[in-house]
Amino acid sequence: MTKKIKIGNLYIGGGEPIRIQSMTNTKTKDIEKTVEQILRLESLGCEIIRVAVPDMESAKAIEKIKAKIHIPIVADIHFDYKLALEAIYNGADKIRINPGNIGGPEKVKKIVDEAKRYGIPIRVGANSGSLPKEILEKYKSPTPEAIVEAALNQVRLLESFDFDNIVISVKSSDILTTIKSYEILSRRTSYPLHVGLTEAGTFIAGCVKSSIAIGHLLLQGIGDTIRVSLTDDPEKEVTVAKEILKGLKLKKGVNIISCPTCARCNVDLIKIANEVEKRIGNLDLDISVAIMGCAVNGPGEAKEADIGIACGIGEGLLFKKGKIVKKVKEDDLVDELIREIYSLYKT
């Protein structure tokens, strides 16, 4: 079990729930837009938010942003240690740094000293695309062993300053390299691990690659926070991350079962399924909901679902646990299903 540490108003590691993290893509100094985006991400289930801090104006904006949101905020720092200090002074709940590009151990120590004084953790780690020259010379390529060694070198630097409030990540854009790196790291440290596939790509490719890597690691008990990194709206990152956790039974949530449709289907099931998902997808209710295009798939094949509908011609069946409850007109099917789900939710 990893060490438990506190980030803002929540804990990670040590048996705590796996936390969903994302990162804003607004200009951090644009406080209004950044807050708006974070609040949307919160509503979808984001539990930790990271913001880039490229300049002093962004670092100073953290105070006003934090005052309007409800989840811990992480400052992402590169190159200038003074940005980290300013972010800490303005209320950052956690700092993410790469000690190798901050400007030497003495500057890292200044960050560590303030992080200790304010009681906030630091995330360090290695990415396959930015390994130190000496590591690449030793291993010839960004192997998992190289990535882990680079990350642990950063950890040892922080530990040399008597600091152990640490989170580690070891990311690659390659699925197998990412998995192997975290497997090695998890055997060599008890610090909490932030898991993700870096630069995973556009929506479909990124979802697939991240789901494979993150899911594989979580099944082994590796990972305390996760981020699905996508070249897309951060809201999609949170939704996909939540689906990964729900799929592995690591988080409560509605599980929607729906058939792929065929010639027997006489309704626009894709539209119906998407509407149901939109209306109930964020409920913290541990049930399975089936949306089937014909009587073949439901309620028979979907009898394991807690509740569902099977569409016909002009009408459909509402069923619970495989037993038909009532016939419903086609136009009323979705609303009736939602009403029944909310009645379950209230109980």
Curated annotation (Swiss-Prot):
[4Fe-4S] cluster binds at residues 259, 262, 294, 301. Its EC number is 1.17.7.3. It comes from the Bacteria. It catalyses: (2E)-4-hydroxy-3-methylbut-2-enyl diphosphate + oxidized [flavodoxin] + H2O + 2 H(+) = 2-C-methyl-D-erythritol 2,4-cyclic diphosphate + reduced [flavodoxin]. It is an enzyme of class 1 (oxidoreductase). Binds 1 [4Fe-4S] cluster. Keywords: 4Fe-4S, Iron, Iron-sulfur, Isoprene biosynthesis, Metal-binding, Oxidoreductase. Its cofactor is [4Fe-4S] cluster. Transmembrane segments: none annotated. Pathway: Isoprenoid biosynthesis; isopentenyl diphosphate biosynthesis via DXP pathway; isopentenyl diphosphate from 1-deoxy-D-xylulose 5-phosphate: step 5/6. One of its GO terms (biological process) is isopentenyl diphosphate biosynthetic process, methylerythritol 4-phosphate pathway. It holds the Pfam family GcpE. One of its GO terms (molecular function) is 4 iron, 4 sulfur cluster binding. Converts 2C-methyl-D-erythritol 2,4-cyclodiphosphate (ME-2,4cPP) into 1-hydroxy-2-methyl-2-(E)-butenyl 4-diphosphate. Belongs to the IspG family. NCBIfam families: ispG_gcpE, PRK00366.1. HAMAP family: IspG (MF_00159). This is 4-hydroxy-3-methylbut-2-en-1-yl diphosphate synthase (flavodoxin). The gene is ispG.
